[in-house]
């Protein structure tokens, strides 16, 4: 999914001639720590200001009088995964979206991004998760996918964690449409794969839910 497919166009950005008092009121109403500032003539993104900056400024001045930060933004053709990364890194509830000309076209909201990720990763689908450890030098999913499908399982989603630098391994979590994945786990072990989780759906579901909860926790700022 691309950023433009989850766009929110209902929330207005700040403009240079907006009063600081009004900008503060809007940020507090939206419960955000910053908002982008857009040129009211060209529609291009000028920068962004934080609530903390505004609270230390004279309330009768305008936003254009403020020293603006470099805006955090995403292009409309970028993937929703990049939006999630930026929101986590900068602790943002609203992420400005621009087109290739850097014209502001809307926002990505935290809730919409989470809904998109949940849909893409099939977190709402019934099934189980199996986590396999792979060494960096041996990293390939082709054989794993073949072995899983040979046991009649359907892969609903795959996530790969950044490898441990010292151990040099990836943790690959694979969501399957089966409740009982004992046969899949046994097959992978027979082919000398290290299976980190191989219990029932109820236990394995905790792994996915924990990862989702961690994402929600960091995005729910």
Residue map of PLM features:
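Histidine- and aromatic-rich ligand-binding microenvironments
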Residues: 50-54, 112-113, 186, 193, ...
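Bateman/CBS regulatory modules and CBS-like beta-alpha motifs in cytosolic regions of diverse proteins
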Residues: 1-26, 37-40, 45-48, 55-86, ...
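Intrinsically disordered, low-complexity terminal regulatory regions
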Residues: 13-28, 34, 206-210, 214, ...
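Short acidic/polar active-site loop segments enriched in Thr and Asp
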Residues: 33, 93, 154
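A conserved regulatory-domain signal marking ACT and ACT-like small-molecule sensing domains
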Residues: 126-221
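Short, structured interface segments
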Residues: 49, 101-120
């Amino acid at each position: 999914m691309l950023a433009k497919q989850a766009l929110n166009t209902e929330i207005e950005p700040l403009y240079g001639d907006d009063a600081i008092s009004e900008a503060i009121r809007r940020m507090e109403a939206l419960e955000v720590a910053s908002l982008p500032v857009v040129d009211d003539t060209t529609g291009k993104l000028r920068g962004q200001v934080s609530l903390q900056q505004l609270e230390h400024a004279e309330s009768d001045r305008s936003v254009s009088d403020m020293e603006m930060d470099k805006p955090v933004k995403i292009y409309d053709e970028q993937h929703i995964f990049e939006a999630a990364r930026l929101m986590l890194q900068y602790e943002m509830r609203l992420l400005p979206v621009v087109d290739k000309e850097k014209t502001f076209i809307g926002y990505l909201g935290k809730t919409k991004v989470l809904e998109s990720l949940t849909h893409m990763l099939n977190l709402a689908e019934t099934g189980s998760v199996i986590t396999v450890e792979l060494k960096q030098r041996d990293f390939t999913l082709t054989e794993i996918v073949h072995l899983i499908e040979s046991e009649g399982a359907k892969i609903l989603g795959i996530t790969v964690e950044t490898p441990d630098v010292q151990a040099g391994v990836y943790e690959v979590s694979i969501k399957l449409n089966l409740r009982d994945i004992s046969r899949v786990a046994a097959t992978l072990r027979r082919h000398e794969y290290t299976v980190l989780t191989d219990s029932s759906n109820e236990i394995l579901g905790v792994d996915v839910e924990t990862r989702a909860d961690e994402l929600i926790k960091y995005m729910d700022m």
